[in-house]
Swiss-Prot record:
Highest rank taxon of the organism: Bacteria
Catalytic activity: Exonucleolytic cleavage in either 5'- to 3'- or 3'- to 5'-direction to yield nucleoside 5'-phosphates
CDD domains listed in its UniProt record: ExoVII_LU_OBF (cd04489)
Protein family per UniProt: Belongs to the XseA family.
Renumbered residue ranges of the record's region Disordered: 499-527
Function according to Swiss-Prot or TrEMBL: Bidirectionally degrades single-stranded DNA into large acid-insoluble oligonucleotides, which are then degraded further into small acid-soluble oligonucleotides.
Name of this protein: Exodeoxyribonuclease 7 large subunit
Bias kind Polar residues: ranges: 513-527
EC number: 3.1.11.6
Keyword Glycosyltransferase: no
């Protein structure tokens, strides 16, 4: 009983707190005691800023772990991008979170814990990316000799962009497109990577021209200042770029991972501009020199060809010498053809005249006269036409011969001779066809004459009466008593005297004479 009362008395001397009160008192004590501290540790569990802009991670060493938070305002003021495993020195204040009885550091400033830690992280990242082939020289692209458009990824307000534009304008003015980015701080790496990807995404024929080469540039600075260009996302974007990239980050002694991933590294931004474009004055001077050498070479070449042509021309015979013999043969053939055509026409004309004289009927005579006239006209036209044709061919032949070498001329002469022979054969064939046609027509007229002649009627037993003048008597009323008549029979003629109807006198027989038939031998055959 005594012990219980003593325990009660002791408990009454200790202040009583609620959970909230003790948590608040602890929070105030921690914040008052550790209101401004610097903590060195390794970043653990870093996943980048939250959607709200705040970042939550932890600082640890080999024996303890301290939760940390960076609010959005402080995050934007960091000069580098925090990464997993990076050793840093964080400046801020300790506080507690009553809801879970945890304490944490609210970081206001943070910096890498010395260059050694950053270099170790940089070397480890360099080895890892190198094993993936991102720095392989075999995948490097060549810079275009004369780009049309240059894309520049840098800060729009620094001296770097002014130096680049000024240098390009001095050497070879062209179109420059600037993609503004932050070149320092937490967001510099993602912005540079987005700019490189954005330039590559431009279409070839879009409203914004697609650059032929990219320059990623920044002025000099410390390792922490340039840390955004060691960001893995930047290295991968530059390595995957289809547009050649020139890295111009920092001074000549500075280096970053983007220098290894780029197609070429420039010591300075001004040097990058000089690598990107040639000197226009040098190009013009080179072009003028090459043009002069080309003109001189062409002049020498033309002179050599002219001399060779003249030498070859002196070795060849003249055109008159080459054409003398073919021209003579051609003239002789033309003369023979004209004479042969004239002689042949005369022979045919005499032949037609002979046959025409043997045909007595006027119809046949007139037809033969027409045929003779047609043949004569044809004979007159053919020499003129042939002469005109030969003259035209001779003129064309001479005109072409003046431009041709000996071999084509000889070949053409041979073809002309063959053509003349063909014309000769065609002429003979045409004359033969005319003769055959006239012969057939004469035979048809002869058969027609025999059919229509009165002598064929005499063969059937009829007779024909002629008056004293030898004209046929067509009507009995035209004959008077006492008129001397002759009656022609098939085999001869009988002389009679016309008498009255009442008295008649025996007719005196007169010596009959054979009437030559059209087919008698004295007349001869037409053909």
């Amino acid at each position: 009983m005594g012990s219980d009362s003593s325990f009660t008395g002791a408990s009454s001397n200790v202040a009583e707190y609620s959970v909230s009160e003790i948590s608040g008192a602890l929070k105030r004590t921690v914040e008052d005691t550790f209101g401004h501290v610097r903590v060195r540790g390794e970043i653990s569990g870093y996943r980048g800023p939250h959607s709200s802009g705040h970042a939550y991670f932890a600082l640890k060493d080999d024996r303890a772990r301290l939760e940390a938070v960076i609010w959005r305002g402080s995050m934007s003021r960091l000069r580098f991008r925090p990464e997993e495993g990076m050793e840093v020195i964080a400046t801020g204040k300790l506080t507690t979170y009553p809801g879970s009885s945890k304490y944490q550091i609210v970081i206001e400033q943070m910096e890498p814990a010395g260059a050694g830690a950053l270099m170790a992280l940089l070397e480890e990242r360099k080895r890892r990316l190198a094993t993936e082939g991102l720095f392989d020289p075999a995948v490097k692209q060549l810079l275009p000799f004369m780009p049309r458009v240059i894309g520049v990824v840098t800060s729009p307000t620094g001296a770097v962009i002014r130096d680049i534009i000024h240098r390009i304008a001095d050497r070879y003015p062209l179109h420059v497109i600037v993609w503004p980015v932050r070149v320092q701080g937490e967001t510099s790496g993602p912005e540079v990577a987005a700019a490189v990807d954005g330039f590559n995404a431009l279409p070839d024929e879009g409203n914004i021209p697609r650059p032929d080469v990219l320059i990623v540039a920044r002025g000099g600075g410390s390792l922490e200042d340039l840390w955004g260009f060691n960001d893995e996302i930047v290295v991968r974007a530059v390595a995957a770029s289809h547009i050649p990239v020139i890295s111009a980050v920092g001074h000549e002694t500075d280096w970053t991972l983007i220098d290894l991933a780029a197609d070429i590294r420039a010591p300075t931004p001004t040097g990058a501009a000089e690598m990107a474009v040639p000197v226009k004055a040098d190009l013009l001077a080179t072009l003028a020199g090459q043009s002069a050498r080309l003109s001189s070479a062409m002049s020498r070449f033309i002179d050599l060809k002219r001399q060779a042509h003249r030498s070859a021309a002196r070795a060849l015979p003249s055109a008159d010498q080459l054409l003398a013999l073919p021209r003579r043969r051609f003239d002789e053939a033309a003369a023979r053809l004209t004479r042969a055509l004239f002689v042949n026409t005369q022979k045919k004309r005499v032949h037609f005249d002979g046959h025409a004289r043997q045909l007595s009927p006027r119809l046949l005579q007139r037809r033969f006269t027409e045929l003779q006239r047609d043949v004569s006209a044809l004979g007159q036209r053919l020499p003129r036409a042939l002469e005109a044709f030969l003259r035209e061919r001779r003129t064309a032949f001479i005109h072409r011969a003046n431009r041709l070498s000996a071999e084509p001329i000889l070949r053409r002469t041979k073809l002309t001779s063959v053509a003349i022979e063909q014309l000769d054969r065609r002429r003979d064939q045409a004359v033969r066809l005319l003769i055959e046609r006239a012969k057939r027509r004469g035979q048809e007229l002869e058969r027609l004459m025999r059919t229509l002649s009165y002598e064929s009627v005499l063969e059937r037993g009829f007779a024909v009466v002629f008056d004293e003048e030898g004209k046929p008597v067509k009507q009995a009323g035209s004959v008077s008593a006492g008129d001397a008549l002759s009656i022609r029979f098939r085999d001869g003629e009988v002389a009679v005297v016309a008498g009255d109807e009442d008295e008649s006198e025996p007719a005196k027989l007169v010596q009959t004479k054979k009437v030559q038939s059209p087919g008698s031998g004295n007349q001869g055959s037409l053909f």
